[in-house]
């Protein structure tokens, strides 16, 4: 049986709540592109939640999405606090998840090696 700390459990609940907001189209800012919430790290005191997201697109689209998410922080914070039923409303920070792009880069390099070697 795996045991998870409270911040990990709350992070998973926050991730699900924000995913639900996105699925239901409640973030209507046109700057926010199609994003995927890849994870949430919550501080031990549950007062800060860093939300990691990924998206396809160029640097300008990423910057626009970040601005849209920053503008929606208050709304997201209220909705998350209500959905997760938290006593303290965590401050939300959005961060682009670079690991997805790095994984894509590694996959591309492996494909190139396979094609060169004839695997």
UniProtKB/Swiss-Prot annotation:
Q: What GO CC annotations are associated with the protein?
A: cytosol
Q: Which PROSITE patterns match?
A: RBFA (PS01319)
Matching entries from SUPFAM superfamilies are given as: Ribosome-binding factor A, RbfA
The listed locations are:
Cytoplasm
Source species, domain of life: Bacteria
Q: What is a GO molecular function of this protein?
A: ribosomal small subunit binding
The answer, when asked if Cytoplasm is one of the entry's keywords, is yes
Q: Which GO terms describe its biological process?
A: maturation of SSU-rRNA
UniProt keyword terms in alphabetical order: Cytoplasm, Ribosome biogenesis
What broad class describes the main subcellular location of this protein? cytoplasm
* Complex formation: Monomer. Binds 30S ribosomal subunits, but not 50S ribosomal subunits or 70S ribosomes.
Alphabetized HAMAP family for the sequence: RbfA
Reported function:
One of several proteins that assist in the late maturation steps of the functional core of the 30S ribosomal subunit. Associates with free 30S ribosomal subunits (but not with 30S subunits that are part of 70S ribosomes or polysomes). Required for efficient processing of 16S rRNA. May interact with the 5'-terminal helix region of 16S rRNA.
User: What family does this chain come from, according to its entry?
Assistant: Belongs to the RbfA family.
Its name, as the record gives it, is Ribosome-binding factor A
According to its UniProt entry, this protein's organism is: Myxococcus xanthus (strain DK1622)
């Amino acid at each position: 049986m795996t045991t998870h700390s409270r911040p990990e459990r709350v992070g998973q609940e926050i991730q699900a709540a924000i995913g639900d907001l996105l699925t239901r189209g409640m973030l209507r800012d046109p700057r926010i592109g199609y994003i995927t919430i890849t994870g949430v790290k919550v501080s031990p005191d549950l007062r800060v939640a860093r939300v990691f997201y990924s998206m396809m697109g160029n640097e300008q689209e990423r910057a626009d999405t970040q601005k849209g998410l920053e503008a929606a922080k208050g709304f997201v914070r209220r909705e998350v606090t209500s959905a997760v039923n938290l006593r303290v409303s965590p401050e939300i920070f959005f961060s682009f998840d670079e690991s997805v792009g790095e994984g894509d880069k590694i996959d591309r390099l492996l494909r190139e090696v396979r094609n060169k070697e004839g695997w």
